[in-house]
């Protein structure tokens, strides 16, 4: 579909107030064929304060015909139209997977998406929970008569002909639980993950290029800047977005005095609501790009710093066992739900990404300062359990 053919109705996501993330009720979708006539990704974007990253759904053709959907995205008219095109060639959607128990940005789409495919079985990761009340799945919008919990053994499900999967035992964080299900597609030797692994591209993903405003907003150095739309500025904005998204507040970022922030807003050249009325409470250090390069690690597989410091290190032994089981599969490529995709990587590279569980962090300790401070606060007030000792 050409850009001229897109209308606001095509992009409509009416349930955005449930999880009010940018771009709210208007979401573009890009479909990419990864393996010819076999595997496709559907990308949208979402975030807060223009800290936006891709969110990805994977669709795979089953050997017996029909389609498998991993981690649905917002079922906008554009997205459903692209799905119908695949159905017309490869058969109807048979299975829809909710592979996470904690990612509300993934959960919110599953029920509305499933309504467009009334014959599909919806499989969900075990130990689902909701906050502030732990509600039945049907109350969360999932179809009651065709939603099933994934059993521990993939061979006991109809999925076993095409896939193996491994469920990460639920990690009790006191304030909630974390778990996800990794799927391995035998034919394409593709590993599917939700949040457990990422690879950071140097340049902005295509879905962010469709509307570069968030990239250019974060490319600014001061509130007074009017940033020209160039590839270099888009790249700078993307790399800073990555630092925000994965570190919250990297050490190369200072927050100026709020009196100065408001004073600068009065002199900003763009004061629209879109530009937050000129407010720009960020001051980047000269070596911010070095911090990005350290984080990116030349595009290798990594575990997001937030997961390294606040979540996966709570049940180290169980996480390592989960990683070891996944590493037995003959992986050739990895498709996570965020950042780069597809990633050409094997089982050994996947396993190495989790080396922080038994060794020192492979990211610079100074860059983890904010996250470790959050960790110390949560543990001190007994809001989360303390991290395990490294094995």
Predicted regions and their residues:
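Short His-Asn-centered micro-motif
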Residues: 70-73, 97-102, 106, 124-126, ...
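Short active-site-adjacent helix-start/loop capping segments
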Residues: 50-51, 77-80, 104-107, 131-133, ...
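Active-site HxH/HxHxD metal-binding segment of metal-dependent hydrolases
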Residues: 87-159
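Catalytic core of the metallo-beta-lactamase
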Residues: 2-81, 135-223, 246-254, 258, ...
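Small-side-chain structural scaffolding
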Residues: 57-58, 120, 124, 128, ...
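Cap/insert and terminal regions of metallo-dependent hydrolase folds
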Residues: 73, 85-95, 101-104, 108-116, ...
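A general structural motif
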Residues: 64-66, 90-93, 119, 187-189, ...
